[in-house]
Amino acid sequence: MASGIRCFRLLHPAFRSYHAALTRPVSEVSMKTVSGRQHGHRQYSAYPAVPVRHFATKKAKAKGKGQPQARVTVNRALVEDIISLEEVDEDMKSVVEALKDNFNKTLNIRTAPGSLDHITVVTADGKVALNQIGQISMKSPQVILVNMASFPECTAAAIKAIRESGMNLNPEVEGTLIRVPIPKVTREHREMLVKLAKQNTNKAKENLRKVRTNAMNKLKKSKDKTSEDTIRLIEKQISQMADDTVAELDQHLAAKTKELLG
């Protein structure tokens, strides 16, 4: 009995430095036993196993990079008093629809008279569609005519609008008559249209960034009356919506590129 008491007194000092280990139940403390002899008696001393913290290696951290982030789904009705995610979604969708409309009206292999209808002309009275101030017709398979006799004062503005329409057109003027030669369907022409499609897609992405920035700025105004966790969650939702829209824009560009290159 006496020898048993003596053996527990001979605890290693390191044991006393682990206060956290002492506060846990004995069943949770990992003990290490060391045997030895003192005064002719075999004695055993108990030492707590030193806790080891395993840090992530650089290789493990690198492996985690590039992994898809967990998606969030915010109940739009619950945050309506903070920001209307429905309106943000509609604004982002309008960017996509504008690009699709641009692709359909201006980027076609063969230019038809209808392609010129909605070209916007800047006049002294404001912006108007070309078909509202000029009579558009097909003179031949190679030439489109725009008769500006009804609004001769807008002829110069119409020529400028056609040239800057992004359709790779080079109009020629004869008095109030604008001749628009239709580009030949060459490989160079196709590649030019693809280049314009990329430019229009980049403009759409710029408009999308403006929508995202406006939404984030609106959200910041609610930081004083909304918890940080809620703000961060909504920010993540908005960023996620923007990323999804970018992916959709890229899909439309890929489809248009395939169509144009044949």
Swiss-Prot record:
Belongs to the RRF family. The keyword Zinc does not apply. Responsible for the disassembly of ribosomes from messenger RNA at the termination of mitochondrial protein biosynthesis. Acts in collaboration with GFM2. Promotes mitochondrial ribosome recycling by dissolution of intersubunit contacts. It comes from the Eukaryota. Residues 1-55 form a transit peptide. Transmembrane segments: none annotated. GO terms for biological process: ribosome disassembly; translation. GO terms for cellular component: mitochondrion. This is Ribosome-recycling factor, mitochondrial. Coiled coil: none annotated. It is found in: Mitochondrion. InterPro entries: Ribosome_recyc_fac (IPR002661), Ribosome_recyc_fac_dom (IPR023584), RRF_sf (IPR036191). Keywords: Mitochondrion, Protein biosynthesis, Transit peptide. Pfam families: RRF. It comes from Mus musculus.
